[in-house]
A protein has these predicted regions:
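Gly/Ser-rich, acidic/histidine-flanked active-site/gating loops
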Residues: 17, 23, 171-231, 256, ...
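Short pre-catalytic strand/loop immediately N-terminal to key active-site residues, enriched for Gly-Thr
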Residues: 37-43, 81-96, 311, 318
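Alpha-to-beta junction loops
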Residues: 57-61, 107-111, 290-292
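Short helix-loop capping/hinge segments that flank enzyme active sites or metal/cofactor-binding pockets
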Residues: 14-32, 231-277, 336-345
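Gly/Ser-rich catalytic serine loop of serine hydrolases
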Residues: 45, 89-101, 114-115, 119-120, ...
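Structural helix-boundary/capping segments
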Residues: 55, 106, 110-111, 115-194, ...
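Serine-dependent amide/ester hydrolase catalytic core
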Residues: 50, 240-327
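Short, well-ordered alpha-helical
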Residues: 1-47, 52, 66-72, 196, ...
Length: 375
């Protein structure tokens, strides 16, 4: 079913962990979902996060599929296959860490490790109805992950429940010390962003049920940060993968995106860095007034596979609410919330102060406990 690109057992008898195939495991090739790396030699050493998983006595169960070169949000991959979204088989699994999210949602792994450059952990987690964390930039080692250089990308965990996700952070993030859930006094800023009204209503109801006090909030440069984030992604991905274009080695969608990325100017990058600084300060200032910031992970249900293949605008709408926090570097967690009418799970995003991943996870756990109690 294309969730895994290779299945094997490595390590102890602890929790089952799936690893995205853009992260090195010694003895196994890292192909990043691309024909361009079909003949890649086996990695000679483990990525830091893989070594941490093995040191904890956990069991790696295989390498998971992804959107080619981790440069896409649908998870559709015509070379290595497209994972099935376990909660909605007619809809995209999300990308780029599609197989990682699908493996956890299908119960094939307790935890998965992915990467998030512009939403690539949070988007598939939300699509597949599980939890996923983009840690504070730099908090979790990227050594052994592709691309080798990125000012946006973060290695992060997926899990069906917050207890497992927190356990994963304890393993892959040195110094991660879980915090107890707060008792009262949680004042959250719910960002005023464009999304389907019924989706926002469901998420706000879950927040109310948790006993959190919420207030609407607007960030002036939120939309600009989305565009600036793409500018930075384009420059960095062209530097990493531009040499693969024009050779028939990569899929048409990724080839087109890379060629478009090649036209990014130095002036555009400079402007994006100005937005990065300004928006980061805006988020920092907002977090002085609120415990965390909240917003939907996706503005709508994931597009169907048919919509995605037909180039629907729904695909372009998958990342506006996640990419800004790659640009700013703040930790951002998506927690599943069940829609009353359909039974599908959508994502509520929790954004915290830099370095306070533990606090973000504590609130995520509290929210999930409240949701379970009210079901």
């Amino acid at each position: 079913m294309s969730t895994f690109v290779s299945e094997f057992l490595l390590g102890g008898s602890g929790k089952r962990v799936a690893i995205k195939d853009s992260i090195d495991i010694a003895g196994h090739p890292t192909r990043s979902g691309s024909r361009a790396f079909a003949d890649a030699p086996p990695a000679t050493r483990h990525a830091d996060v893989v070594q941490s998983v093995l040191d904890a006595g956990w069991q790696i169960v295989g390498k998971t599929n992804l959107h080619e070169l981790a440069f896409g949000v649908t998870g559709i991959n015509d070379w290595s296959g497209t994972p099935i979204n376990p909660q909605a088989p007619d809809r995209v699994p999300g990308g780029s860490s599609s197989g990682s999210a699908a493996a956890v949602a299908a119960g094939l792994a307790d935890i998965a490790i992915g990467t998030d450059t512009g939403g690539s952990v949070r988007v598939p987690a939300a699509c597949c109805g599980i939890a996923g964390l983009k840690p504070t930039y730099g908090r979790v080692s990227r050594a052994g992950a592709q691309p080798a250089v990125s000012s946006l990308d973060c290695v992060g965990p997926f899990a069906a429940n917050m207890q497992d996700l927190i356990a994963a952070m304890q393993v892959i993030c040195p110094g991660f010390a879980p915090q107890a859930a707060p008792v009262g006094g949680v004042h959250v800023g719910f960002l005023d962003v464009a999304c389907e009204p019924w989706l926002k209503a469901s998420l706000m109801a879950a927040v109310d049920a948790a006993g959190w006090r919420q207030q609407r909030l607007h960030l002036d440069d939120f939309e600009a940060a989305f565009g600036a984030g793409l500018t930075v992604i384009n420059v960095e991905n062209w530097a990493a993968f531009g040499h693969l274009t024009g050779k028939g080695l990569i899929g048409a969608d990724v080839e087109q995106r890379l060629l478009a990325a090649s036209r990014t100017s130095a002036a555009e990058l400079a402007d994006a860095e100005v937005v990065r600084t300004r928006f980061s300060h805006q988020v920092d200032a907002a977090l002085e007034a609120f415990s965390v910031l909240l917003l939907p992970t996706l503005p709508d249900l994931p597009p169907t596979l048919a919509q995605a293949r037909n180039g629907s605008q729904a695909v372009a709408g998958m990342t506006p609410l996640v990419r800004p926090f790659n640009l700013s570097g703040h930790p951002a967690l998506t927690v599943p919330v069940t829609l009353v009418d359909s039974g599908l799970k959508v994502g509520l995003q929790i954004v915290g102060r830099k370095g306070q991943d533990e606090w973000v996870c504590a609130l995520g756990a509290q929210l999930q406990q409240s949701i379970t109690a009210h079901q």
